[in-house]
Amino acid sequence: MEEPQKNDLSMRGQEEDHPVRSSGPQISVSEFSCHCCYDTLVNPTTLNCGHSFCRHCLALWWMSSKKTECPECREKWEGFPKVNILLRDAIEKLFPDAIKMRVEDIQQNNDVVQSLAAFQKYGNDQNPLAPSTGRVNQQRGGGFFSGVLTALTGVAVILLVYHWRSRESEHGLLVHKAVDKWTTEEVVLWLEQLGPWASLYRDRFLSERVNGRLLLTLTEEEFSRAPYTIENSSHRRVILMELERVRALGVKPPQNLWEYKAVNPGRSLFLLYALKSSPRLGLLYLYLFDYTDSFLPFIHTICPLQEDSFGEDIFTKLLDLREPTWKQWREFLIKYSFLPYQLIAEFAWDWLEVHYWTSRFLIVNAMLLSVLELFSFWRIWSRSELKTVPQRMWSHFWKVSTQGLFMAMFWPLIPQFVCNCLFYWALYFNPIINIDLVVKEIRRLETQVF
């Protein structure tokens, strides 16, 4: 009687070691294990590389890494992974009890359930309509960027034609012409560019036929009496301050973006890209190396004194070379630390009357860049990567510095037409690209679990 019992026990042990008995090769549980959790596969999902994982393991991996690649071989997958139905049915038939227990454990884990939901939502966004949506999305994305490239090509051709046809007129600007050679019409043009208020004195300068040489001889006393009769002391002060700058330079100083670009093509391109990619370092550069000509007018424009904020126009603020007060420094440093792009937007806002569309492009781009910066900070905080901030800051500083040094070294070799294309690309096309980046960040944020 004891021997049959021993035979029964040995047979049960063999059944436990080999749950599936057949006339062919025997199958063990380890052959159907996930390479992430090393347990029986639940809803096995097979990637393009051929590796299979539990769907919730793949979702957890995607949530933590934000990468669409295989956890084992790191090969990127295409499309959105789906459950391997044939493999799932086979495992459920071979190990029904183990699968049932694992499914119950998964359903009771809120983190896993939320990760699966976010992962599935990400897949729905990738394929919202039909199985062929992936190809449609690729065509749609390709169509968008091909449209941008087509527009850029068209603009480049227009700029090429304009560059060759307007070369003489560009050199004919007052910023390139000696003041003693100005005509009466050019003197009036210089006067009108001081501000809307200067149109009050336009006819007086025309009637007196004031040319460049005569302009250089005028004094404050002559401006205050007939025939000029400029009674407003603020207007006289602005005209005299600007006249002193003209006398010192010998030409008209730049008073808008296009004149500044004509006089300083390299610096304008450098500042545009520096303030776009790294506004804090760009403003620090202005403070250290261009304090009087650029930084002082900038801080007086964006952080004006209370008594001057309503009475002065933009040109008067540009001529204000007084040292900033502590109140101005405090306002500037707060915005500089937390919202640097707002400083650029506020500066562009004051130029709306002079540059109607260009200022609006700059304001929109500054808003978009602020949103992208907030997304970057949120990503660092949500991933608990605050310790990497110093290293990121150093890498960013090194990248911007090397790019600036590279540009300074090779600037004489770069054709002016290429520089113009880069300038207009950053000015007008960069906001379109940033809109697309913000939309992608918002969609990515919707798939994250809070």
Curated annotation (Swiss-Prot):
What are the SAM domain coordinates in residue numbering? 182-249
Name one process (GO BP) from the record. Answer: negative regulation of IRE1-mediated unfolded protein response
Q: Give EC number(s), comma-separated.
A: 2.3.2.27
Residues exposed to the Cytoplasmic side: 1-140, 353-360, 426-450
Q: Which UniProt keywords apply?
A: Apoptosis, Endoplasmic reticulum, Glycoprotein, Membrane, Metal-binding, Transferase, Transmembrane, Transmembrane helix, Ubl conjugation, Zinc, Zinc-finger
GO cellular component, alphabetical, reads: endoplasmic reticulum; endoplasmic reticulum membrane; membrane
One of the Pfam families matching this protein, by short name: zf-C3HC4_4
Q: How does it assemble?
A: Interacts with CASP8, BCL2 and BCL2L1 through SAM domain and also with HIP1, IFT57, ESRRBL1 and BCAP31. Interacts with NGFR; this interaction inhibits NF-kappa-B and JNK-related signaling pathways.
The name of this protein is Bifunctional apoptosis regulator
Which gene is the coding source of this polypeptide chain?
Bfar
